[in-house]
Amino acid sequence: MEAQRRSHQEKQTKGHACGRSLPEPRVASGTLISTVDRSSEAYRRLSGTELGRPKLCPQRGRPHSRRRHRTTFNPAQLEQLESAFGRNQYPDIWAREGLAQDTGLSEARIQVWFQNRRAKQRKQERSLLQPIAHLSTATFSGFLPESSAYPYTYGTPPPPAPCFPHPYSHSLPSQPSTAASLALPPQPEDWYPTLHPAPTGHLPCPPPPPMFPLSLETPKSWN
């Protein structure tokens, strides 16, 4: 009986203790008062200040950033990589694995090195081509004509007009030497073409011979 009484008393004391730790909500002036734990620790858990926030650096007050590990290559590794780059700028997986075994580097590091090396070569090529292009435009600009409105044209001259002989040159009899020596002096029409040349493309034709031959005989008087 005594044992039953003791167990009953222990249950009552436990119930009173639970009732004290968990008070029932009370209604005061028509409002419901909640029993949510508003301690600083619980508020931090609910507000999410401790979830997913980067820790601040105590020295500078900045969040810790993920640092990238920079690989340093020794001269022997650089020599092997440069020789492989000279043979093939785009090595496949098998070539990269072979280089990894020879140099002691990982295949991923070798792939990144080849990507950086190709980018460096393209940058060097662009830097070399820029002054050459500027020099070529400045050099050849002096040889070009200032204006192309009047291009150079070389036209062919028209063919010369044929000079036909006079129709009476073959029908007239030959003159004696004495008649030729005493011929009249040339008329202004004969020596005019010599002073004023004919226009381009037309050759001057010789003047026609006199229609009637000259005679040395004097006319007789009709006495």
From Swiss-Prot:
Residues 1-69, 168-223 are annotated as: Disordered. Pfam families: Homeodomain (PF00046). Residues 171-180 have a biased composition (Polar residues). GO terms for molecular function: beta-catenin binding; chromatin binding; DNA-binding transcription activator activity, RNA polymerase II-specific; DNA-binding transcription repressor activity, RNA polymerase II-specific; RNA polymerase II cis-regulatory region sequence-specific DNA binding. It is found in: Nucleus. Belongs to the paired homeobox family. This is Homeobox protein prophet of Pit-1. It comes from Mus musculus (Mouse).
